Amino acid sequence: MGGLKKPKKKYLEGKPKKIWNKQLLLEELQLVGEYGLRNKKELWLARAHLKWIVRRARSLLSMTPEERAPLELPFKEKLYKMGFIEDPNVPLDRILSLDVRAILERRLQTIVYRKGLAKSIYHARQLVVHGHVAVAGRRVTSPGFLVPRDLEDKITLIE
């Protein structure tokens, strides 16, 4: 009969422990500018997603080869379909070396800019938020939408 539960923040895994570390602040500022993020929470969300991937790869590495075999290929195929890795046959050690840029490169805002549909990364964000971008014929208004590899060439501008 109590009140509603407070929703859990999705970026806590990616939030740095020491937020006033000068080196970290400069690195975050550079990433926010390079990828046109609105605030650091978007960067922390990407870091949290990366942390989930690395944690899953680490747990697979800790298993015996017999336990790992049925779980490893689907995990790698999922990462390949999302575009985080270039080949589904890469070793798990390479997955551990992914960085946050791999996640940020798959955002709709970044892909719209990289394809040349926008003049700048900020223009790409505005196009997405205002509903001028469609992915596979469906309007997407979230610049943080992670575009799978098979939908990457189906991004179009709509009026």
Swiss-Prot record:
Does the entry feature the keyword Ribonucleoprotein, yes or no?
yes
Q: Does the keyword Ribosomal protein apply?
A: yes
Sorted alphabetically, the keyword list is: Ribonucleoprotein, Ribosomal protein, RNA-binding, rRNA-binding
GO CC, alphabetical: small ribosomal subunit
Q: Which family does it belong to?
A: Belongs to the universal ribosomal protein uS4 family.
Identify this protein by name: Small ribosomal subunit protein uS4
S4 RNA-binding domain segment(s): 106-158
A Pfam match is: S4
Q: What does this protein do?
A: One of the primary rRNA binding proteins, it binds directly to 16S rRNA where it nucleates assembly of the body of the 30S subunit.
The organism named in the record is Pyrobaculum islandicum (strain DSM 4184 / JCM 9189 / GEO3)
Q: Which InterPro entries match?
A: Ribosomal_uS4, Ribosomal_uS4_arc, Ribosomal_uS4_CS, Ribosomal_uS4_euk/arc, Ribosomal_uS4_N, S4_RNA-bd, S4_RNA-bd_sf
**PROSITE patterns with a match to the protein in the record:** RIBOSOMAL_S4, S4
Subunit info?
Answer: Part of the 30S ribosomal subunit. Contacts protein S5. The interaction surface between S4 and S5 is involved in control of translational fidelity.
GO annotation terms (biological process): ribosomal small subunit biogenesis; translation
Q: Name one GO molecular function term.
A: rRNA binding
